[in-house]
Amino acid sequence: MSNMEKHLFNLKFAAKELSRSAKKCDKEEKAEKAKIKKAIQKGNMEVARIHAENAIRQKNQAVNFLRMSARVDAVAARVQTAVTMGKVTKSMAGVVKSMDATLKTMNLEKISALMDKFEHQFETLDVQTQQMEDTMSSTTTLTTPQNQVDMLLQEMADEAGLDLNMELPQGQTGSVGTSVASAEQDELSQRLARLRDQV
């Protein structure tokens, strides 16, 4: 097995591992959603909110893993092409010895240009691999947008057939719905302010 074939194997393996990680995160998200429903049914909104944050985090992680898996898979496909073309060139080299006449008519400039393209592709491959590593490291620090948490809480309450406002303990009534509405109101206010500034 050549170095390039080993590299290809490692890329394909990495793509599968990333895909497995995405599926694991999907399972974790579903488990957290089930915990949200139980917490809402018990009227424990603080615990429900924690599970909602965890569920959103797992969902975001799953998307990131899936995206990276696709990128690594795309890079692996490029390497596969390069490895295959390398093999074709070697097999051609054996045949070429008996093809002096054909060799004499070959355009060396075109061969040289083709080699340059190969080298450039592998340089690009290295850059993309580095970008992939940088992206993966940056996605490990994930924040959980509160409006997503609020929306998920409402969705889980709806699925459980509960009215959040009715089931909430005294003093917390309507906190989820209100915070979503106020967040939307804040966003509208900011948009209006930006429009005024532009005029």
Curated annotation (Swiss-Prot):
Widely expressed. Expressed in pancreas, kidney, skeletal muscle, liver, lung, placenta and brain. The keyword Disulfide bond does not apply. A motif (MIT-interacting motif) lies at residues 186-196. InterPro entries: Snf7_fam (IPR005024). It is found in: Cytoplasm, Cytosol; Endosome; Late endosome membrane. One of its GO terms (molecular function) is protein domain specific binding. Residues 167-199 are annotated as: Disordered. Gene3D superfamilies: 6.10.140.1230. Residues 183-199 are annotated as: Interaction with VPS4B. Its main location: cytoplasm. Keywords: Cell cycle, Cell division, Coiled coil, Cytoplasm, Endosome, Membrane, Protein transport, Transport. Belongs to the SNF7 family. Probable peripherally associated component of the endosomal sorting required for transport complex III (ESCRT-III). ESCRT-III components are thought to multimerize to form a flat lattice on the perimeter membrane of the endosome. Several assembly forms of ESCRT-III may exist that interact and act sequentially. Interacts with CHMP1A. Interacts with VTA1; the interaction probably involves the open conformation of CHMP1B. Interacts with CHMP2A. Interacts with VPS4A; the interaction is direct. Interacts with VPS4B; the interaction is direct. PANTHER family: CHARGED MULTIVESICULAR BODY PROTEIN. This is Charged multivesicular body protein 1b. The gene is CHMP1B.
